[in-house]
Curated annotation (Swiss-Prot):
Function of the molecule: Binds to the 23S rRNA.
NCBIfam families for this protein: L9
Matching HAMAP family: Ribosomal_bL9
Keywords of this entry: Ribonucleoprotein, Ribosomal protein, RNA-binding, rRNA-binding
Name the UniProt record assigns to this protein: Large ribosomal subunit protein bL9
SUPFAM superfamilies reported for this sequence: L9 N-domain-like, Ribosomal protein L9 C-domain
Segments passing through the bilayer: none
Organism lineage: Bacteria, Pseudomonadati, Pseudomonadota, Gammaproteobacteria, Vibrionales
């Protein structure tokens, strides 16, 4: 299925690219999320007239994401308290929701879908650097300290 991308999509293309994707991916994800439109003659003409507006919108989103990344990078002392055993192992784990809530409480709004934990949930006491993807091109790093709750 041919679609016109309205946003940069990883491993697919950038704004204005006409790409061929599976119909289920287009119908269930790209089109409902507003990231693509069907590549009909009318939509191609409509896109060409709105190209400058869409490029300005994408640039504005990128600038806002870079500003958020700067504020995440400057955060000091994001601490999460959790019950732990004597040897530093947590009872349970610290996941993306816990990290997003802690960073949001520290003053920068972060959604749990933006937190990246490639090794999975954190299960030990200590200091960790957590990657946060605020935009397809913008990454930030937050220092998280996990301490034992009293």
């Amino acid at each position: 299925m041919q679609v016109i991308l309205l946003d940069k999509i990883g491993n697919l293309g950038g704004l204005g690219d006409q790409v061929n994707v599976k119909s289920g991916y287009a119908r269930n994800f790209l089109i409902p999320q507003g990231k693509a439109v069907m590549a009909t003659k009318d939509n191609v003409a409509m896109f060409e007239t709105r190209r400058a507006e869409l490029e300005a919108k994408v640039a504005e989103q990128l600038a806002a994401s870079e500003a958020r990344a700067e504020s995440v990078n400057t955060l000091e002392g994001v601490t999460i308290a959790s019950k732990a055993g004597d040897e530093g192992k947590l009872f349970g784990s610290i996941g993306t929701r816990d990290i997003a809530d802690a960073i949001t409480a520290a003053g920068v709004a972060v959604a749990k879908s933006e937190v990246r934990l490639p090794e999975g949930a954190l299960r030990n006491i200590g200091e960790f650097e957590v990657s946060i993807q605020l935009h397809s091109e913008v990454f930030a790093t937050a220092k998280i300290a996990i301490v034992a709750a009293e």
